[in-house]
A protein has these predicted regions:
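Active-site residues of response regulator receiver
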Residues: 52
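Acidic, metal-coordinating helix/loop segments flanking the phosphotransfer/catalytic sites
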Residues: 30-48
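Hydrophobic/aromatic residues positioned on beta-strands within the core alpha/beta folds
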Residues: 79-81
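C-terminal output helix
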Residues: 99-112, 116
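Short acidic/polar segment at the start of the alpha1 helix of CheY-like receiver
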Residues: 10-14
Length: 119
């Protein structure tokens, strides 16, 4: 079962994303900011990270930069969801907010199948 880490500072959206991915058959963990997400990735590397870009403590761009700088996490596919898509430069795919759940699942599925090959 693919493991997905959802990173968003909005608890309601995090809950909703968890439910969507769980119903699609994925094991899901979540974090409320980039710093908590880094700790989660180091504890148990996910198969995919789905992250917001604008968060407190550590924002999405910094979180992605740190993931990419560590050999153990550099190849984890990253799907950025953001109202400001130019912030997601190092992500493997970007879905602008607002987005449709079906499209989110489709892009996430492609990243899980092909890894970072979509870049």
């Amino acid at each position: 079962m693919p493991r997905i880490l959802v990173v968003d500072d909005e608890p309601d959206l995090r809950f909703l994303l968890r439910r969507i991915f769980e119903r699609a058959g994925h094991e899901v963990t979540d974090a409320g900011d980039g710093a908590a997400a880094l700790r989660a990735v180091r504890e148990s590397a996910p198969d995919l990270v789905v992250t917001d870009m604008m968060m407190p403590v550590m924002d999405g761009p910094e979180f992605i930069r740190r993931l990419r700088s560590e050999p153990a996490t550099a190849e984890i596919p990253i799907l950025a969801v953001s109202g400001d898509s130019h912030l997601a430069g190092a992500a493997d795919a970007v879905i602008p907010k607002p987005y449709q759940w079906g499209h989110l699942l489709e892009v996430a599925g492609d990243l899980l199948k092909e890894g970072r090959g979509l870049r």
